[in-house]
Every structure is written in C-alpha cells, then in structure tokens.
C-alpha cells in the first residue's frame, strides 16, 4: 500500500487532472446555452477542474456577458469564488461576487436535471443562515456529493464530488480512508 503522502498527492493530482482541457465539460453533459457560451463555459470548467479559480471566473463572466440568461455561467461565477482546497477563506470581495451570482441563480431556470443539481450544490455554499466557512463548505460538499450520486455517468459531477469529499475529509487517521476511497473512485472514472 502506498504511503499517506504519495496517496494524498495522487488523489489531489487525479482530482485536478480528471477533466483536463482534452476532456471538456461538453463530453460529460450538455449546457443549456448557446454554442458560443457553452464553449466558454467548458473552458471555465476545465480551469475549475485544474483549480485555476481566478482564470475560470474570467471565462464564466465572458459567458454571462454573451448570454445573460445562461444559468451555468452564473453557476461558474459562484463556484469560482470559493476554493475548497486552498488555505484560508474567500475574501470579502469573493464572497460578494459569489453571493451575487447565487442570488442571480435563484431567479434563473436550469435547462436540465444535472444543471439544476450542480446549481443547487454551488448555491448551498451561499445559503442564508449558514455561519462560518467550514459550515458553508460542508453545506456545499453535502449537496455536491449528492449531485455526484444522482449523476454517476457525469465526469464533472464525479470530479466535483471527489473534490467535496477531500475538502471535508476529517483530519487525522480517518482522512487516509477518505483519500483512498476518492482515489479509487477517480481511478474507476479514468478506466471508463
């Protein structure tokens, strides 16, 4: 069995690279927006999967400007403004931008069941009445893991569910089993 450090590295690398630019979001699920906006969202999704949140937000903003009614553009903005594995918490400006996107999402109609579930997961982070970053992260993680379970054939949903499991994994010895399980899940996705 690999040691803890190598297993942790493998899981994080697998999560970051699961949906690389060569495997676009469009191959996992179709976005209910114009082709041009969908392509830009796919670029943003690839950046999100590689934890390039600042660059991803730029792509999602471009898509939102192209097509203001595209819910997945706002989803991307909301998701880009918290960073589950980065140290620290979102800045006040990031929280404001993410909350504004989540507020906008509440007025929009998703185009499919998976869009609805992905939007619900991102919005769970910004839900009213949740105090503190760890509680917000747990709210998002629970919803994101559920989304992954509801859409087992979606590489994107599975990758974000894996990220969610890592983000809320317990500290200490229990973390090893979570990381191992996530690694097994990602290995199975790569085998498809």
Which sequence ranges carry the predicted segments?
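Bacterial N-terminal signal peptides that target proteins for export
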Residues: 2-12
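N-terminal signal peptide c-region/cleavage motif recognized by signal peptidases
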Residues: 19-21
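Short coil/linker segments at helix-helix boundaries
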Residues: 24-153, 158-192
